[in-house]
Amino acid sequence: MFCEQCEQTASGNGCHQWGACGKSPEVNAVQDLLVYCLRGLAPVTIKARELGISCHEADVFTGETLFATMTNVNFERKRFNVYIRQCIHIREGLKNSIEKISKKPISWSEVSNYQPNFSESLAEQGREKDLTFISQSTNNVDIFSLKLTVLYGIKGTASYTFHAQELGQEDEKVYAFIQEALASLDRNDLSLEDWVNIALKVGEINLRAMELLDQGHTTTYGHPTPTKVPLNPKQGKGILVSGHDIKQLAALLQQTVNKGLMVYTHGELLPAHGYPILKEKYPHFYGHYGTAWQNQTKDFAHFPGAIIVTTNCLMPPHETYEDKLFTIGPVGYSGINYLSSDDKGVPDYSLAIETSLKMAGFTTDEAPRHVMVGFAHNTVLNVSEQVIEAVKKGEIRHFFLVGGCDGAKPGRTYYTEFVEKVPKDCIVLTLACGKFRFFDKQLGEIGNLPRLMDVGQCNDAYSAIKIALGLAEAFQVSVNDLPLSMILSWYEQKAVAVLLTLLYLGIKDIRLGPTLPAFITPNVLRFLSETYNLQPITTPDQDLVACLA
């Protein structure tokens, strides 16, 4: 087994016996075989595009299946077997279309002609392809490092592309680049500089993917507005939705109208409460339950209703709640209820709804607690004049973007302590599940501006970027000259994509933790440090002094 795509890799050197995420070596190998098959599909789509043949089915399929191979998304080996069959079927169909149009015979590469042996172990075939990929790439470990960076980055981009496509937002340029990046992984003629440029291109395309997703969310559900979200359960029956997929949350809300259920969010669906159309249309869209993904074994066990996981992060479920757990879309786990989608991409949630209605629900009202969400780019930039005036008056000294992924490894208390120690004349912007280290802290206000502003989900890094660019334009300086520091945490491949976007934009002085990626070699890290001053976190006190100097 070889996997080092997430932050919690064993001893910081990659997982070689069993995934720290709970992924078995067999699932890892079948996932890698799927990626190999996608690498073979990619050159076929590139040729099809040249000939004007539609690749939409292949593009959407690639987005979903790359998403499924991300950390804590899908552990179901049989689903990957099906994906591999579908991949080969789509590839051969495109080949047939190409051959009907092409004026000369096409000579396909080995990877594009590969045929898995479905009567033999796919896991073993995946291991063989892993070894070949590693052996062909390790003549230059720095190039191999950047190849992995590109692969993990496009996995993150694919997840945002998948969600945007669900909401009707697509861009041929995004699809085409994902295929080009996959095809490039089998090229051995590219230099280190070429791979740096491809990695930065991932960042550029990921920015567009996040923009599409932002457009999908805001045109469908309205621009987020500051909203008070209850954290205290309410007496009555409920159903819990975890993950990131706001379209699926909206579908569940529609299917639970007049059912006598309160709908609670979990994890990164907290920011969904800021979308005005959801709050206005669905009065049973009540509150938020629990904290970050790594606490789900406790949160899910205690929740007295059904739980639907729409995306990552899914942990191997505990027997205390596996019967009331449901997965959808690219998410899966062996033995757990899976709700398949109709031709519009929406599951029938009846089984989950019936499960919740049979359960006791919350028997009492808990003491009121709440947090605020909804400070996305539209909200913040609408008060930019007020912000600028406060900066000029010295009321606001500095902005900190403290966000990213949360995780279970030690060292993440750094982010809690950092935010607690931020001076009272500074604003903290946050996003993604890293916020759960401090999301309920009462930091007060500067004037009528809250000192802690929740920008949204991990994909709402786009919102944070728009805020930074908007403030830079207003102050007539570059983003790097703003009184702004980025203190980021990472865990999985979406964070890799977002980091590449920030580097593509030329943003410097980012502090990253709690540990640096295992797939980044010392030479690549040196390049990032020298070019962008990317640096690891140290201690909250030391980093605060440096940021405010």
UniProtKB/Swiss-Prot annotation:
GO biological process: response to hydrogen peroxide
Cleavable signal peptide: none
GO molecular function, one term: hydroxylamine reductase activity
EC number: 1.7.99.1
Alphabetical UniProt keywords: 4Fe-4S, Cytoplasm, Iron, Iron-sulfur, Metal-binding, Oxidoreductase
Chain sites annotated for binding hybrid [4Fe-2O-2S] cluster: 244, 268, 313, 405, 433, 458, 492, 494
Note describing how the cofactor binds: Binds 1 [4Fe-4S] cluster.
Positions with a binding annotation for [4Fe-4S] cluster: 3, 6, 15, 21
Annotated positions of the Cysteine persulfide modification: 405
Catalyzed chemical reaction(s): A + NH4(+) + H2O = hydroxylamine + AH2 + H(+)
GO cellular component: cytoplasm
Cofactor: [4Fe-4S] cluster; hybrid [4Fe-2O-2S] cluster
Family to which this protein belongs: Belongs to the HCP family.
Biological function: Catalyzes the reduction of hydroxylamine to form NH(3) and H(2)O.
PANTHER family the record matches: HYDROXYLAMINE REDUCTASE
This protein's name: Hydroxylamine reductase
Organism lineage: Bacteria, Bacillati, Cyanobacteriota, Cyanophyceae, Oscillatoriophycideae
Gene from which this protein is expressed: hcp
